[in-house]
Structures are given as structure tokens and as C-alpha cells.
Swiss-Prot record:
<feature type="compositionally biased region" description="Polar residues">
    <location>
        <begin position="1"/>
        <end position="10"/>
    </location>
</feature>
<dbReference type="Pfam" id="PF17458">
    <property type="entry name" value="DUF5421"/>
</dbReference>
<feature type="compositionally biased region" description="Basic and acidic residues">
    <location>
        <begin position="14"/>
        <end position="34"/>
    </location>
</feature>
<feature type="region of interest" description="Disordered">
    <location>
        <begin position="255"/>
        <end position="283"/>
    </location>
</feature>
<dbReference type="InterPro" id="IPR035359">
    <property type="entry name" value="DUF5421"/>
</dbReference>
<comment type="similarity">
    <text>Belongs to the chlamydial CPn_0705/CT_671/TC_0042 family.</text>
</comment>
<protein>
    <recommendedName>
        <fullName>Uncharacterized protein TC_0042</fullName>
    </recommendedName>
</protein>
<feature type="compositionally biased region" description="Basic and acidic residues">
    <location>
        <begin position="44"/>
        <end position="81"/>
    </location>
</feature>
<feature type="region of interest" description="Disordered">
    <location>
        <begin position="1"/>
        <end position="96"/>
    </location>
</feature>
């Protein structure tokens, strides 16, 4: 009996030793390590690790945000400095009104074109309504033509209060040949109207003289004035001779003499050439 007990005890001890060795291959730590903070609160090991990782990440985020903030602050400082420099170098820097203004030389061709365009615009702004009113109040029809090198203008005077009654409905014809101008009033209703128009012209010699002088100032000569079938005698303007006029007349006289001498010499030369040709033909 004692031997059996001893054997069983040894066997049980061996079995327990084998279990202990088997368990020793896989060691397990079942302890719960707790960390006590200064505030008197405790936390487990896993919570401590989680808290540590969160703190580390928060530190990284804080450092990253601080770096980004510093970069933004630096860029803001740089931009503010550039704005200050631009304001400092602006158009009114130091009270100089021309600071920052670029002066360029305009080519003469461009300047002349601009001047021509400005003049054209200025001319187009002139009020020509009075011309329209004059034509509408005095002219019924207008004809402008060029006949055999002569410029012809024919106007039918309107029956209006602005036109004298003796000339209402008559045709006014102007013919210009070089510097000479001929004026003709025609197509009257009857001979009585022709007589009235002729009488009106003869009773106003001052106006006729003024007409001749105004045409003369425009380098035009009134050579003929006809009312119906009657030619009006034109006033003769007194020629005022000045030293300049005398010099001009002398120059024209010398030019005419020189032209005549040149023509005579040319004729003599042509005659000699013809004589030579005849002699050569005879030989």
C-alpha cells in the first residue's frame, strides 16, 4: 500500500512537472499593470499606450500647423512689404506728379495723321444748315454740267419772297471759261417781266459794281450779263497801278519778248535744216 502511494505520488508529481514544462513553452503575463497619475486617477497599460500615441500625433499636428502658420506669416510679410514698396514707388511718390509715367516720342507720320483726322472731324462739325436754307428758299432746281470745256450751272429761281418778283421763275445760267464768267437770266414769263428785271438792274448800279468787285477778288472776271435778250453794260473798274504792278507788267513784257525771240530763232533753225536737206537731195 505504501509502495503504491509512493508510486502514485511520484506519478502525479511527474505529471504536474510535465504540465508545468508544457505550459512554460507559452508564457503568458496575466498581470494588469496600472499607472497612477498625479491627479489620483489610474489607467491601464493599453490606455496609456493609446494616450501616448494620441499625444504623439497631436504633437506632430501641432508642430505641422505651427510650421504652416509660420510659412503663411512669412508670405504675408513679404506681400505686405511688396505692397508698401509699390505704394512708395507709385505715381505720386514724393509729390512728383510724373513719377512712373513713361514718355514716348510720337513719330511725325503718326502725329500728322492724328492732326489730319482731327481737322476732318472739326470740319464735319461745321453747321451748314444756312446753305440748305438758302438753296431751299431761292432755288427750285439746279443743274451743273461741263459743256465743251466750259463749266455750266443753271438755276431755276423759286417763287419766294426772298427772290425779287421780277426774277421769280426765271433761269439763272452761269458759264465759266477759265477766269471769265458770263451770267444770263432767261426764260421769263413775258416781255413785261423782262422789262421789270432790266429796270431793276439799271436802277442798282452799286450792286452791279459790288458784284464785279467780289468776282475780281476771287480771280474771276464778269465778262457778260444778259437779262432776257438785252446785254447789260458792265461797270469798268479803275486799275490802281502800284510799283509792284509796274514791276509785274515789265516782267511779263520781257517774258513775251523773250518768247517771241525764241520762236524766231526756232523758225530760222528749222529753215536752215530744210535748206540743208534740199542741198543734200540735189547732190
Amino acid at each position: 500500500m505504501e509502495v503504491n502511494k509512493t508510486t502514485e505520488s511520484l506519478f502525479s508529481a511527474k505529471v504536474e512537472h510535465n504540465h508545468a514544462q508544457a505550459e512554460s513553452h507559452e508564457p503568458r503575463d496575466q498581470r494588469d499593470v496600472k499607472v497612477f497619475s498625479l491627479g489620483g486617477k489610474s489607467s491601464s497599460k493599453q490606455e496609456k499606450l493609446d494616450h501616448g500615441s494620441g499625444r504623439t500625433s497631436s504633437r506632430h499636428e501641432t508642430s505641422r500647423s505651427s510650421k504652416e502658420g509660420s510659412i503663411e506669416d512669412k508670405s504675408a510679410e513679404v506681400s505686405s512689404r511688396e505692397e508698401e514698396e509699390e505704394n512708395r514707388d507709385g505715381f505720386l511718390s514724393g509729390g512728383n506728379l510724373t513719377a512712373g509715367v513713361a514718355f514716348t516720342d510720337t513719330p511725325m507720320a503718326v502725329a500728322s495723321e492724328v492732326m489730319i483726322e482731327t481737322n476732318a472731324v472739326t470740319m464735319s462739325q461745321i453747321d451748314l444748315q444756312w446753305v440748305e436754307q438758302l438753296v431751299l428758299s431761292t432755288v427750285e432746281s439746279l443743274l451743273v454740267a461741263d459743256v465743251d470745256g466750259k463749266q455750266l450751272v443753271e438755276i431755276v429761281l423759286d417763287n419766294n419772297s426772298t427772290v425779287p418778283e421780277a426774277f421769280c421763275g426765271a433761269n439763272l445760267t452761269l458759264v465759266q471759261t477759265g477766269e471769265d464768267v458770263a451770267v444770263t437770266f432767261s426764260n421769263f414769263v413775258d416781255q413785261d417781266q423782262v422789262a421789270e428785271a432790266m429796270q431793276l438792274v439799271q436802277q442798282n448800279p452799286e450792286q452791279l459794281t459790288s458784284l464785279v468787285e467780289s468776282l475780281k477778288s476771287r480771280q474771276l472776271n464778269l465778262t457778260e450779263l444778259v437779262v432776257g435778250n438785252v446785254a447789260v453794260s458792265l461797270p469798268v473798274l479803275e486799275k490802281v497801278e502800284t510799283p509792284l504792278h509796274m514791276i509785274a507788267a515789265t516782267i511779263r513784257h520781257h517774258d513775251q519778248e523773250g518768247d517771241q525771240e525764241g520762236e524766231g530763232r526756232q523758225e530760222q533753225h528749222q529753215g536752215r535744216q530744210q535748206e540743208k536737206k534740199l542741198e543734200e537731195a540735189q547732190i
